[in-house]
């Protein structure tokens, strides 16, 4: 872990920059999102989309996926070497929805990847603009986090499905760089490491030879990223043990699962960024807004401001509730899938309900769904207040929570107590305290037991009026202390399937 002095802020990671001051960071993040906006406008022109069609979130997602696919070098190389039936490795595409005679129709489009890369580079002053691509990946990841529950993935790696609050960023592609690593939850990192260890157990040659050396370096790097997320010395010491293991196996998997559980109370630092769909940046650029001159931040008021003045539409299936669809997208935009619903509701200004009570499926429409009865509605993405996104897990103390999700991972830096259900979590910690990590385990369990439910996190931090862009008057909300609020509570959300 780099020492405190060399930590880069998210915006620096986001823009691949070295150390910059606040103004330079705002300018480079502004440059990044205006590049996305210019690209989107150009794609709408190419596809001859009307203004309304260009504001359709499903069209935005298709266009975003096309550019991500065009720049996915590893997959492109793989497709060239393993030609599969009916897949042209040089082309990319997806469904574009158009309004015809009062109905929505789906049209499948196909483009040369080379052409998409050219348009993207042209919109980004001739550069590859990797930061912008990562930004789109994070928006897709945040949307997945709000839409799906990763129960099956958790169970497959031997973790408890109720640990879903640790799974932020679990669908991020491997190539998402430092900005991607910053937003990954503790559970996501643990899952990646367990998968790796399991491969090593099953495949004798996994850690051997030239390839094995590279694998080992990747393993240690992932261990260090996870170590950097923990805030207590004992958790970090355990990570050192896992990293230094000569031949990672079941003992390491046990340690990692132990650490993941401990993170429900001794929460890790996980970054949160408001990444918006490309069409939102496109709308702003088209209306003459100069992101680079004005500067932009993913963790301050700017995304809230942008959403206050953007009209985005979504296709709605016959029995879906448009207000619920809006909530889903609002949560995705602010990376708030694992935030306490009490906090989200206060900021949004309307009640944010648990996933199981939403009458809506995912945003994307499957290719076999019937378009006949599809309608479209405006998404309500505005908020009553804004708050600063956090990169810490809040201080480590908790309270009772629900059956579906037994902890939260805060998104907004706002004073509250952090709900968790001690009995449920501590029940998992009986027994195994022997072995080489016994003293650390004992220490971690002791810290967890002394965490007090009522303790307040983010002391004195509040939300701000949308007119208060300099964050001068914090409004500290008061919450009902006994009323926990986790989103995946007792839930039946769909599974995420690749």
UniProtKB/Swiss-Prot annotation:
InterPro entries tied to this protein: Flu_NP
Q: Where in the cell is it found?
A: Virion; Host nucleus
* Keyword terms, alphabetized: Capsid protein, Helical capsid protein, Host nucleus, Host-virus interaction, Ribonucleoprotein, RNA-binding, Viral nucleoprotein, Viral penetration into host nucleus, Virion, Virus entry into host cell
Location of motif Bipartite nuclear localization signal in this chain is 198-216
Listed SUPFAM superfamilies: flu NP-like
Pfam families membership: Flu_NP
Description of post-translational modifications: Late in virus-infected cells, may be cleaved from a 56-kDa protein to a 53-kDa protein by a cellular caspase. This cleavage might be a marker for the onset of apoptosis in infected cells or have a specific function in virus host interaction.
MF terms from GO for this chain are: RNA binding; structural molecule activity
Please provide the Gene Ontology terms (biological process) for this protein.
symbiont entry into host cell; viral penetration into host nucleus
Q: What is its main location?
A: virion
For the region Disordered, what residue ranges are annotated? 1-21
User: Which ranges belong to the motif Unconventional nuclear localization signal?
Assistant: 1-18
Gene Ontology cellular component?
helical viral capsid; host cell; host cell nucleus; ribonucleoprotein complex; viral nucleocapsid
**Family listed:** Belongs to the influenza viruses nucleoprotein family.
Q: Subunit comment for this entry?
A: Homomultimerizes to form the nucleocapsid. May bind host exportin-1/XPO1. Binds to viral genomic RNA. Protein-RNA contacts are mediated by a combination of electrostatic interactions between positively charged residues and the phosphate backbone and planar interactions between aromatic side chains and bases.
Q: What does this protein do?
A: Encapsidates the negative strand viral RNA, protecting it from nucleases. The encapsidated genomic RNA is termed the ribonucleoprotein (RNP) and serves as template for transcription and replication. The RNP needs to be localized in the host nucleus to start an infectious cycle, but is too large to diffuse through the nuclear pore complex. NP comprises at least 2 nuclear localization signals that are responsible for the active RNP import into the nucleus through cellular importin alpha/beta pathway.
- Please report the name of this protein according to its UniProt entry: Nucleoprotein
- Organism, per UniProt? Influenza A virus (strain A/Chicken/Hong Kong/31.2/2002 H5N1 genotype X1)
Lineage at the top is: Viruses, Riboviria, Orthornavirae, Negarnaviricota, Polyploviricotina
């Amino acid at each position: 872990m780099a020492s405190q002095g060399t930590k880069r802020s998210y915006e620096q990671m986001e823009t691949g920059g070295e150390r910059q001051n606040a103004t330079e960071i705002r300018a480079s993040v502004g440059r990044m999102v205006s590049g996305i906006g210019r690209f989107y406008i150009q794609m709408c022109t190419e596809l001859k989309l009307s203004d309304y069609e260009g504001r359709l979130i499903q069209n935005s997602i298709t266009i975003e996926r096309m550019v991500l696919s065009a720049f996915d070098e590893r997959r492109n190389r793989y497709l060239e070497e393993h030609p599969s039936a009916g897949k042209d490795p040089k082309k990319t595409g997806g469904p574009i929805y158009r309004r015809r005679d009062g109905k929505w129709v789906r049209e499948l489009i196909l483009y040369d990847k080379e052409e998409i890369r050219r348009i993207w580079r042209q919109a980004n002053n001739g550069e590859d603009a990797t930061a912008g691509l990562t930004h789109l990946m994070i928006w897709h990841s945040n949307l997945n986090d709000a839409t799906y529950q990763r129960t099956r993935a958790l169970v497959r790696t031997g973790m408890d499905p109720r640990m879903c609050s640790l799974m932020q960023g679990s669908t991020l592609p491997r190539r998402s760089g430092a900005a991607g690593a910053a937003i990954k939850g503790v559970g996501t990192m643990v899952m990646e490491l367990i998968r790796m260890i399991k491969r090593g157990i099953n495949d004798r040659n996994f850690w051997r030879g030239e390839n094995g050396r590279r694998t080992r370096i990747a393993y240690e790097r992932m261990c260090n990223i996870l170590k950097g997320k923990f805030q207590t010395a004992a958790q970090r010491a355990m990570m050192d043990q896992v990293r230094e293991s000569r031949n990672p196996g079941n003992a390491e998997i046990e340690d990692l699962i132990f650490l993941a559980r401990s993170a429900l109370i001794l929460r890790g630092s996980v970054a949160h960024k408001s990444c918006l769909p490309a069409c939102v940046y496109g709308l702003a650029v088209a209306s003459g807004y100069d992101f680079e001159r004005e500067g932009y931040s993913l963790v301050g008021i700017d995304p809230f401001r942008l959403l206050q003045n953007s009209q985005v539409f979504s296709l709605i299936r016959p029995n879906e509730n448009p207000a619920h669809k809006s909530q889903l997208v609002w949560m995705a935009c602010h990376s708030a899938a694992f935030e306490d619903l009490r906090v989200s509701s206060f900021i949004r200004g309307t009640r944010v309900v648990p996933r199981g009570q939403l009458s809506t499926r995912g945003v994307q429409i499957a290719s076999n769904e019937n378009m006949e009865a599809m309608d479209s509605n405006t998404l309500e993405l505005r908020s009553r207040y804004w708050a600063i996104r956090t990169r810490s897990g809040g201080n480590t103390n908790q309270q009772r929570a629900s059956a579906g999700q037994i902890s939260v991972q805060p998104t907004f830096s706002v004073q509250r107590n952090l709900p968790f259900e001690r009995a449920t979590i501590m029940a998992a910690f009986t027994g195994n305290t022997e072995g080489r990590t016994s003293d650390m385990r004992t220490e971690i369990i002791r810290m967890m037991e002394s965490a007090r439910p009522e303790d307040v996190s983010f002391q004195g931090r509040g939300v701000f009026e949308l007119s208060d862009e300099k964050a001068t008057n914090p409004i500290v909300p008061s919450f009902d202390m006994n009323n926990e609020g986790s989103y995946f509570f007792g839930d039946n959300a769909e599974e995420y399937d690749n």
